[in-house]
Amino acid sequence: MPTASLETTINGAFDARETITPATRGEVRDAVDQALGLLDKGEARVAERAADGKWQVNQWLKKAVLLSFRLNDMSVIPGGPGNAAWWDKVPSKFEGWDENRFRDAGFRAVPGAIVRRSAFIARNVVLMPSFVNLGAYVDESTMVDTWCTVGSCAQIGKRVHISGGAGIGGVLEPLQAGPVIIEDDCFIGARSEVAEGVIVRKGAVLSMGVFLGASTKIVDRTTGEIFMGEVPEYAVVVPGALPGKPLSNGQLGPSTACAVIVKRVDERTRSKTGINELLRD
């Protein structure tokens, strides 16, 4: 089915989603399955960067991901420790893969790495024991470290390092208009969280424990400029706090958490955050 027809069919089905069930067959199911297949192979993306640097969200692909939950029934998924199983609607991306399939894909997936079908993993990616949700896109030479989560439809660029325990939010619950986007050459520090459609621009560095949502104030301590929803290119960001406003009794109120841009990336920063090509051979 041509892309334009896919989009039309999926948009129409989403408007009538209450009528979609696991018993639904025909054009709608075929369109959703085809859309998820395009996402799985990296031939389509939920969000794409235009030449002007703006990100365009393909809402119809996000709708296809959501519709798949209406179309697919629960089933037993084998492979748990101790011969246990799981009970879910979304199969593993790696279901049925053999050695040749992994070699062709060209990335590493160590034991404990979970990737759901319709997520795309590019060549030379390293997946430590982590979780990549459906519809996500992880580009070349990125490291997804231990206990990281890459949320539904999140877009991760090339040569990104997502450190241990960091979380990249998804779009499905709570429902978000746009996915989290981490552009090329970014470093996300351990136990940090980026959610609610925040964009981290090229080359930015988040230190350990930075929490960013759509309403988080990101303060440039050099200029005083405040950003929200977007980290500028090559910014080095640390956790911070804004002074509290006076309370009704005149006392100083509680401070408010924020993020602080302390500098722009320099060679010293690069030496601490650069990727190790030996891990990607």
UniProtKB/Swiss-Prot annotation:
Pathway: Amino-acid biosynthesis; L-lysine biosynthesis via DAP pathway; LL-2,6-diaminopimelate from (S)-tetrahydrodipicolinate (succinylase route): step 1/3. Gene3D superfamilies: Hexapeptide repeat proteins, Tetrahydrodipicolinate-N-succinyltransferase, N-terminal domain. It catalyses: (S)-2,3,4,5-tetrahydrodipicolinate + succinyl-CoA + H2O = (S)-2-succinylamino-6-oxoheptanedioate + CoA. Its EC number is 2.3.1.117. It is found in: Cytoplasm. Pfam families: Hexapep_2, THDPS_N_2. The keyword Acyltransferase applies. Its main location: cytoplasm. One of its GO terms (biological process) is diaminopimelate biosynthetic process. GO terms for molecular function: 2,3,4,5-tetrahydropyridine-2,6-dicarboxylate N-succinyltransferase activity; nucleotidyltransferase activity. Substrate binds at residues 108, 145. Keywords: Acyltransferase, Amino-acid biosynthesis, Cytoplasm, Diaminopimelate biosynthesis, Lysine biosynthesis, Repeat, Transferase. It is an enzyme of class 2 (transferase). Belongs to the transferase hexapeptide repeat family. Homotrimer. This is 2,3,4,5-tetrahydropyridine-2,6-dicarboxylate N-succinyltransferase. It comes from Nitrobacter winogradskyi (strain ATCC 25391 / DSM 10237 / CIP 104748 / NCIMB 11846 / Nb-255).
